Design a protein with these regions (language model features):
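Loop/turn-rich, solvent-exposed surfaces of beta-rich toroidal or solenoidal domains
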Residues: 311-352, 358-403
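Blade-loop segments of beta-propeller domains
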Residues: 68-71, 88-132
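Blade-terminus and WD-like Trp-Asp/Gly-His loop motifs, strongest in beta-propeller folds
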Residues: 71-80, 85, 114-122, 126-129, ...
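Asp-box/WD-like beta-propeller blade repeats and closely related beta-sheet repeat scaffolds
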Residues: 109-226, 242-243
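Multi-bladed beta-propeller domains
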Residues: 45-65, 94-110, 150-179, 230-247, ...
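Blade-level signature of beta-propeller repeat domains, shared across WD40, Kelch, NHL, RCC1
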Residues: 418-462
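Blade/loop signatures of beta-propeller domains
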Residues: 33-55, 220-226
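Beta-strand C-termini and the immediately following turn/loop, strongest in propeller blades
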Residues: 82-88, 124-138, 146-149, 194-200, ...
């Protein structure tokens, strides 16, 4: 009986196998490397309906998507937009608005929101702490990472990149037991980040006797409790903020006022009370806009130092449910009867703006027909508001005169996601994600929609 099996691989075969493995490793490293550059795809396309000149910063089908409107889109210098793309899967890219040059600005993956600092050239995000990037899935402790964008972009331009650790710093680690999600926001002072924690931790801090909410609506979401915590970006120190009896979503900070947080009761649709605000020390918890049962409030976003925009939806038939409804990603979502008697035009609907100080709310505008405005935003100077609708059209509103103008359309209701309009900090342009150039009607690109010059001049004359 043979005790040993002879190795029949020749030296040449072993060498070939080694070389192939080495090439595979090098290929993986190169494709995932921070600072990697991609050629410009920038092109200007004239909207055939409105005549607006659209600036597509990406124009090929590579699975692009923008950051959500609750967060900043541009870097602090106003020159780059951070976005997600399958060009570097599970990594963040920056595109230069003027040249169209693209640069990978993270390495090692991320989860949840990308938080762009507005006082410094920094980017913050979460990632799973395991060193094995192939194992970075749900579960395990999370790290908060800071990226030095200034150094990444400068070294990438000269072709003299250093190891990723040169540009990426671990701010701190969030233990797995906290059940944290990637729903994170950066404070205006950039010294802390806020994030959501899970039911187990939230239950430890909730006031005795608090009624814990169950799921609400047909998507079986919204059950509590949940909580908010913060991490100091310099020391990694963790501090608990508040617990609430419902599911938390859309955590965002006020970019102009330190310590002010806005979040929502997340149900995937209509909520019993959608919008909430709290201070970072846990005080001042209250509904931001106390809503009625018949109001479908959604997609809140801080737009000025004192104001939050949101949509009061008017997408449902007054007589009852519309049987032509689609899933949330389709062209006519939110029609199920389980959402209750909300979202019709029997009551006032439209793009609403509430003042955080006075608590007064005004409706700035609404489309006369169709779904009504859906994802909304506003210019930081208070001059303009913007919203999309189910058809993926984009409407601009003059907040002084209430005049509304169709800016662009044709972005395809079959798109993989919604336009999600977001104003630049100077109030002169709007970023969206668009499937206008997509052959399959789904893949999206990063697009800039300028505010018309005549409207900009009109505003400056007042």
């Amino acid at each position: 009986m043979k005790r040993f099996r002879k190795n029949n691989l020749s030296l040449q075969q072993k060498t070939t196998a080694f070389v192939l493995c080495l090439l595979l490793l090098l290929s993986t490293f190169c494709t995932a490397q921070i600072g990697k550059r991609f050629p410009s795809e920038r092109k200007v396309v004239k909207d055939p309906i409105t005549g607006t000149e659209l600036i597509f910063l990406t124009s090929t089908p590579a699975g692009d998507s923008k950051i959500y409107p609750t967060h900043a889109q541009w870097t602090a210098d106003g020159e780059w937009i951070i976005f997600r793309s399958n060009r570097a899967r599970n990594e963040a890219l920056a595109v230069n608005e003027k040249t169209g040059d693209m640069v990978q600005v993270t390495e090692g993956g991320y989860t949840g929101m990308l938080c762009i600092a507005q006082k410094s050239m920094k980017l913050y995000f979460m990632r799973y702490a395991t060193g094995d990037t192939s194992q970075r899935r749900r579960g395990g402790p999370l790290e908060v990472i800071e990226v030095d964008l200034q150094r990444v972009l400068a070294d990438s331009k000269t072709g003299k990149m250093k190891p990723a650790s040169t540009y990426q710093r671990i701010c701190g680690t969030i233990p797995e037991a906290l059940g944290a999600g990637g729903d994170m926001a950066l404070d205006a002072e950039e010294d802390v980040v806020y994030f959501r924690v899970g039911k187990t931790e939230a239950d430890k801090h909730i006031a005795p006797g608090t009624k814990i909410e169950g799921a609400f609506g047909p998507r079986n979401m919204g059950a509590g409790p949940a909580g908010l915590m913060q991490m100091n970006t310099q020391t990694g120190a963790l501090k608990y903020i508040v617990s609430v009896p419902f599911q938390i979503g859309h955590v965002q900070s006020n970019p102009w006022v330190s310590g002010e947080i806005v979040f929502c009761w997340e149900t995937g649709g209509k909520s019993p009370q959608r919008t909430w605000t709290v201070k970072s020390d846990g005080t001042g918890l209250r509904p931001l806009y106390p809503e009625a049962d018949y109001e479908w409030v959604t997609h809140e976003a801080v737009i000025t130092k004192d104001e939050v925009a949101f949509a009061i939806m008017g997408h449902r038939k007054i007589a009852g449910a519309d049987t032509t409804g689609t899933a949330v990603g389709g062209a006519n979502p939110g029609q199920e009867t389980a959402w209750g008697p909300s979202g019709t035009r029997e009551k006032p609907t439209g793009l609403a703006i509430v003042n955080l100080r006075t608590r007064q709310m005004t409706i700035t505008g609404q489309t006369p027909t169709g779904s009504g405005l859906w994802h909304v935003h506003g210019s930081p100077d208070g001059r303009f508001a913007v919203g999309d609708d189910f058809s993926r059209s984009l409407y601009l509103i003059d907040r002084q005169t209430r005049e509304m103008r169709l800016l662009t359309t044709g972005h395809k209701a079959t798109a993989a996601d919604h336009p999600h309009p977001t104003f630049s900090t100077d109030g002169k342009k709007i970023q969206i994600q668009s499937a206008m150039l997509s052959a399959d009607g789904r893949s999206m690109n990063i697009c800039i929609v300028p505010v018309p010059e005549d409207w900009l001049k009109r505003g400056s004359e007042k």
